[in-house]
Amino acid sequence: MSSAPTTPPSVDKVDGFSRKSVRKARQKRSQSSSQFRSQGKPIELTPLPLLKDVPSSEQPELFLKKLQQCCVIFDFMDTLSDLKMKEYKRSTLNELVDYITISRGCLTEQTYPEVVRMVSCNIFRTLPPSDSNEFDPEEDEPTLEASWPHLQLVYEFFIRFLESQEFQPSIAKKYIDQKFVLQLLELFDSEDPRERDYLKTVLHRIYGKFLGLRAFIRKQINNIFLRFVYETEHFNGVAELLEILGSIINGFALPLKAEHKQFLVKVLIPLHTVRSLSLFHAQLAYCIVQFLEKDPSLTEPVIRGLMKFWPKTCSQKEVMFLGELEEILDVIEPSQFVKIQEPLFKQIAKCVSSPHFQVAERALYYWNNEYIMSLIEENSNVILPIMFSSLYRISKEHWNPAIVALVYNVLKAFMEMNSTMFDELTATYKSDRQREKKKEKEREELWKKLEDLELKRGLRRDGIIPT
């Protein structure tokens, strides 16, 4: 009895080095609805009359029925299944959005649990796994949520619900609780930027309306960031969470609490270390500046933190750090500047000396900033000695003529600020260079003598008498 022919293994299983582009194309074909559910048979929803077509006395009950109908989830992975019912749910959601926006008296106490239930049924789900080795958020297209035609309207409805003049947090807090917020925060890892944008608005509204949830929300964002920095280095919604935090920090009362200062130093500063910094750096820098505008005394720990995590091998990140540093210097108090000027300008001197012209250029652009120039001028007796040797050397040796031109402008500015010290430093630099050249010449002569001596010994060993 012959056995049935075996199917050869697929390429996926045997080729561990299949081309990334092929794997990505295959991924795209199989993407991506986290709303996937196997349907045994077509879903049938009983059509209900439009809310505007029934008497106002019947609208509250019909509103609840429509909310319950919208709890039914469809399989958007199968583009041909339940087309009529998918369209019916979409039109019902649209109707609910309009109704909650226009109608008065629609938010009764009975509607709150049904609204939260409908929203929860639709948005809370396990997100599809994202292989961080495969997906590069800087280069690759994100995986879009297939069920977005429904999901978008659910988010739109929920935002209108939260923004309604009739919305009562005292009733809603029974249903929008810590568990709800925790599930909401998990959704920020969605690859779909459209969803993260809606989530940002939703969380912001919840933070504004539920005073009892504020500390919990901050703590959970803190936990997400710590896990991101020290464990996973993968979370899609960092930029959006930082954007929300920017508004939250702006509203902090003074004096700042110890927990807020700790969040800055222990969480926000270490966020600079991750590889994907470019995806959220603008929002991170904004948060840092907000803190410093609230409490200038935090300037020193922030600057020292940036110096500690300054990139050693990534020029792109160095340029970002320099940009952020300029934003900080734009709001720095002169009294705080004095405390950090030495370590700061030692780092700037290194950047100016960088062989990577974009790093050097970005550092030299500081001298185009009027406020920074005024700070430098007030403290030129400290800053000029730190910067001088690097600037003078670059003016003679740098490979890029554009950088040399910028350096000449900086040297000219320093000369106008403090001509006496400039002349002294120039004389000292030239004297030091002459001394170095003399030592170098002596070293070369010594090596030449040693080589000659070794050569003579070799000749004697070979029986040749040198003349």
UniProtKB/Swiss-Prot annotation:
One Gene Ontology cellular component term attached to this UniProt record is: cytoplasm
One protein family per Pfam: B56
Q: Which SUPFAM superfamilies match?
A: ARM repeat
Please list the residue ranges that the record marks as compositionally biased, kind Basic residues.
20-29
- Give UniProt keywords alphabetically: Acetylation, Cytoplasm, Phosphoprotein
User: A GO molecular function for this record?
Assistant: protein phosphatase regulator activity
How is the subunit organization of this protein annotated in UniProt? Found in a complex with at least ARL2, PPP2CB; PPP2R1A, PPP2R2A, PPP2R5E and TBCD. PP2A consists of a common heterodimeric core enzyme, composed of a 36 kDa catalytic subunit (subunit C) and a 65 kDa constant regulatory subunit (PR65 or subunit A), that associates with a variety of regulatory subunits. Proteins that associate with the core dimer include three families of regulatory subunits B (the R2/B/PR55/B55, R3/B''/PR72/PR130/PR59 and R5/B'/B56 families), the 48 kDa variable regulatory subunit, viral proteins, and cell signaling molecules. Interacts with SGO1.
Record's protein name: Serine/threonine-protein phosphatase 2A 56 kDa regulatory subunit epsilon isoform
